[in-house]
């Protein structure tokens, strides 16, 4: 049985910054939607005002899937995740293993398509704009 969509449905159950005090609660699904909206806007601004030629739909799709590993790992607050290069590297390895398992929960022909968003090429302008949006 393929469980990819059931696993992604958990995004609405994963609280972000759960270990930190926050005035507004946000779940992983809300965060992904926010990053998609801001990222796509950044791409449209770049294309409209700065002569860019970025795929704004790809930015939005990258944003929707950028934290999918957290449906298994939960949210690790940014100050911890980036505390040291060693911790960042270890956490990246954990996320990669989880993302591999998520892709295995799809039929192979579909996993190939989703891999573009779950294990993206981090050198593209679309990915870089999505990461900027993730920090807003």
Locations of regions flagged by a protein language model:
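Short, solvent-exposed segments of well-ordered alpha helices
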Residues: 2, 22-29, 123-127
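Histidine/acidic-rich helix-loop-helix segments that form or flank divalent-metal centers
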Residues: 54-60, 104-136
